[in-house]
Every structure is written in structure tokens, then in C-alpha cells.
Amino acid sequence: MKTYHQKPTEVQRDWYVIDASGKVLGRLATQISTLLRGKHKPTFTPSIDGGDFVIVVNAEKIVLTGRKPDQKIYYRHTGYPGGIKATPYKMMLAKHPDRILRLAVKRMLPKNRMGRRLLSKLRIYAGPNHPHAAQQPKPYIPRW
């Protein structure tokens, strides 16, 4: 029996909507990255973008466990000498709640063109509303 390789023209994409309220950040991010890559499908092919579109609502209500809300710090660098910037989790949650989940998912995807294309299929909204009703997204309940 030959190994099946999916072709880009054979990909069937679905839209899923996930409610992030009360969900743990890392556990939710793993589920989202699996959906984006298409690893939940029996036709998964590593070199083909066969994943689905994911809409996340209520990103501002995401949860971290333990002392991480007080201790977690996000680092970035401007590119200039001495240009390292640190942003605590609580400040990031107040200003950019969608960026927290986007960074967690981005770091779980491949670090190449495929990963950037997969990340473009992720739509994150801080509140409960989203403008993608025309795509008729199916509700997705994460396992954890």
C-alpha cells in the first residue's frame, strides 16, 4: 500500500470558533496549533497547508495557572544595542489580550513560510463577538 500525499487542490478547510474564557493558555494553544496544521485530519501531510481556520473569542478571559500571572514576562528586542524590552503578563493582558494567545500559538508552529501562512488563518478577538458569521464557523470544544 502506498503512502497517501494530499495535494493542495484536495484540501477541505473548515472554520471553527473557540471560546477561550476560563481555558488555560498553553493547553488551548496546543489545540489551536493542531487545528491550524491539520494534524487532526487523517489526510495530514507535513508539507501541505491542510489545516482549518480558527476564530478565538473572549481572549481577555484566558487563564494562567500558579504564580505565572505575577511572574511571566514577555521579551522582545528592537534590534539596537541594549534594546531589549520586557512586558509583564498583566500589562500585556490589559493592553493586548489577543497578542498573548497569538504568541503562544506562533511559538508552537513551524518557524518557516509554512508557519507564517498557518498563523494567518488564526483570528483572535478579545470580546465575545466576531465578524465571521458568513463563514458559518462550527463550535469547537477543546479537550482540556
From Swiss-Prot:
Source domain of life: Bacteria
Biological processes, Gene Ontology terms: negative regulation of translation; translation
Keywords: Ribonucleoprotein, Ribosomal protein
GO CC annotation, single: ribosome
Disulfide-linked positions: none
Matches recorded under InterPro entries: Ribosomal_uL13, Ribosomal_uL13_bac-type, Ribosomal_uL13_CS, Ribosomal_uL13_sf
Transmembrane segments: none
UniProt-listed CDD domains: Ribosomal_L13
GO molecular function: mRNA binding; structural constituent of ribosome
PROSITE patterns, sorted: RIBOSOMAL_L13
Pfam family, one: Ribosomal_L13
Similarity comment: family membership: Belongs to the universal ribosomal protein uL13 family.
HAMAP family xrefs: Ribosomal_uL13
Function, in words: This protein is one of the early assembly proteins of the 50S ribosomal subunit, although it is not seen to bind rRNA by itself. It is important during the early stages of 50S assembly.
Subunit structure of this chain's protein: Part of the 50S ribosomal subunit.
Annotated protein name in UniProt: Large ribosomal subunit protein uL13
Natural source organism: Chloroflexus aurantiacus (strain ATCC 29366 / DSM 635 / J-10-fl)
Gene: rplM
